[in-house]
Swiss-Prot record:
Superkingdom, taxonomy of origin: Bacteria
Catalytic reaction annotation: 7-aminomethyl-7-carbaguanine + guanosine(34) in tRNA = 7-aminomethyl-7-carbaguanosine(34) in tRNA + guanine
Stored Gene3D superfamilies: Queuine tRNA-ribosyltransferase-like
Pathway this chain belongs to: tRNA modification; tRNA-queuosine biosynthesis
GO biological process, one term: tRNA-guanine transglycosylation
The name this protein goes by in its record: Queuine tRNA-ribosyltransferase
EC top class, as a word: transferase
Amino acid sequence: MTVMKFDLIKKEGKARRGKITFPRGDIQTPAFMPVGTYGAVKSLSPVELKEMGAEIILGNTFHLWLRPGTEIIKKHGSLHGFNGWDKPILTDSGGFQVFSLGKMRKLTEEGVTFKSPINSSKVFLSPEISMQVQRDLGSDIVMCFDECTPYPATEKEAKESMELSMRWAKRSKEAHGDNPSALFGIIQGGMYEHLRDESLAKLKEIDFDGFAIGGLSVGEPKEDMIRILDHTAHQMPEDKPRYLMGVGTPKDLVEAVYRGVDMFDCVMPSRNARNGHIFTSEGVIKIRNSKYKDDTSLLDPNCDCYTCKNFTKSYLHHLDKTKEILGSRLNTIHNLTFYQNLMKSIRKALDEGRFSEFRKEFLASYK
């Protein structure tokens, strides 16, 4: 029996306002989860994450398993004890990372054999191992082990990949056993609606605590992503959280909420911050651009983060040009605050019954 509880508070069209409850804390949905690949959101402390409103972060099973390894993390009690984050943590299963290794991996019914990106040693990962690693990490939300269907994929390739993921989903559920953490199933099927339907039906049969849409934002055109979202999101169980994996831009988040999604994660706000791409209420600023060299205005007048209250575009441009670590930190503080504030605005609009209006205004003003 899972310790997770999900309450659907309100709906506007397909958009949903909810709350996920864990012993470690509540998550107001729709929610964005900052990504802490190696147990840390790059350059930020848990205190800073809490200050910007994050209620859950994501950890990477694959990378934490390889380094530092679960034995070291278990000595701290859990990943929470290791990284000082005392709120909920979701861990992905490692399936996407194995998929991204490409030719370095060998896929069989049993699992995946691959060369470690750290020391090139041979490593084997299976649904059973992934479930054990996530149990050792003490994850609040565990993701079942799947193969992320590549793009492009023929219908035959997508079907074979999806069916393998469904067999692995069943094994993940069995291996999860009496672990009280929530276990989410992952819908695959590439860009084929009928395969997505088949995948969802099989996952419902196995019965998970939450459901995720995987295999999107892997290189497909935006219209294909929206088409699959349109077709799939509203068919997911009404009484369980719906998670869109690895997506996306601010517009993507608004559009996915409109279609009934509750949870998101993406490296985009933190990765883009390190490359000088800053999200603001009026669109993206490329702070590396020379036009900001003597721009004494603040970054975003509509943002109350530490960066926006204290530093000019000129200073942030200077930090970027000189490759100062502080520049990456300040940009990351802002970008992740922007994402958390966007989710707060979405939740407020849903609370007040004006999300449709909010969506129209946001899509019109955000460039």
